[in-house]
């Protein structure tokens, strides 16, 4: 039996799931099921927000351990579902080790294109504006702010800007755009536009996963996710506040 390849499959599956926003307990569970197909005495998986460790050990082999760092994380539920389905098929014996590895490699390479990501970034504010009580004007201004947000996110990722600074700059850009438009037009609610336009940045999934990990006893990952969500929220608030002050929208007297 190719123990090394089974280990590689488990680590690759875990990496894809963790990058796609899966909870750490779910990643560990999937990896453990894959590792158990090796039928070794020791088959362990340890997952944190930024890394994965997996080990296989038996009397007739040298211990095998693999570690993978995970730097970039996002949200892609479809990829999580795909990995779960492939892992189940492999564990049921419907796929070989080689077939499973190739399928996982294909999933890892499937990412949203920049155009699709930017389109979604624009449509989210457009969808939330009516939900928050906005009318046609709020929706149109939210679309404009969404375009600015999409541009800043694309630029920030291209130059590999840190997430805290990128979130702050994006919130700043959204607030400045909305506040500047409010100076030349009237008859719409500035708060609705800013809140709607910032929704793509809100760490809702991160907070949910943090609570799930914490309730399952994974305090390290849960605490790390809570801290990440808090820093994201702080960056959004800082950027939006500075942006409004910058254009004199927060204080009628002008910039302070």
Label each PLM-derived region with a short phrase.
Residues 1-95:
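Soluble N-terminal domains of membrane-associated systems
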Residues 68-72, 132-138, 189-193, 254-256:
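Interfacial loop-to-helix junctions that mark the boundaries of transmembrane helices
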Residues 183-256:
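Generic detector of multi-pass transmembrane helix bundles and their immediately adjacent loops
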Residues 72-138, 228-237, 248:
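Alpha-helical transmembrane segments and their cytosolic membrane-interface
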Residues 111-188:
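Core alpha-helical transmembrane segments of integral membrane proteins
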Residues 2, 19, 23, 75-78, ...:
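Catalytic cores of large soluble enzymes that bind and process phosphate-bearing ligands
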């Amino acid at each position: 039996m190719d123990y090394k390849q089974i280990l590689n499959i488990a680590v690759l599956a875990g990496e894809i799931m963790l990058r796609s926003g899966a909870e750490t307990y779910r990643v560990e569970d999937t990896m453990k099921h894959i590792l158990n197909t090796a039928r070794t005495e020791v088959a362990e998986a340890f997952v944190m927000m930024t890394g994965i460790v997996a080990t296989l050990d038996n009397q007739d082999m040298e211990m095998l351990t693999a570690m993978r760092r995970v730097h970039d994380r996002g949200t892609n539920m479809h990829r999580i579902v795909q990995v779960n389905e492939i892992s189940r098929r492999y564990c049921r014996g419907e796929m070989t080790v080689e077939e499973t590895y190739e399928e996982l490699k294909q999933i890892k390479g499937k990412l949203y294109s920049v155009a699709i990501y930017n389109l979604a970034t624009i449509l989210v504010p457009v969808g939330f504006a009516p939900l928050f009580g906005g009318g046609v004007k709020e929706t149109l201004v939210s679309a404009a702010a969404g375009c600015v947000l999409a541009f800043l996110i694309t630029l920030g990722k291209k130059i590999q800007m840190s997430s805290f600074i990128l979130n702050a700059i994006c919130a700043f850009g959204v607030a400045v755009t909305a506040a500047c438009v409010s100076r030349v037009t009237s008859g719409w609610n500035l708060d609705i536009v800013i809140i709607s336009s910032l929704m793509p940045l809100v760490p809702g999934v991160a907070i949910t996963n943090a609570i799930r990990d914490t309730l399952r006893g994974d305090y390290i990952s849960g605490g790390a996710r809570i801290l990440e969500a808090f820093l994201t929220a702080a960056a959004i608030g800082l950027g939006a506040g500075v942006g409004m002050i910058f254009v004199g929208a927060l204080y009628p007297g002008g910039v302070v």
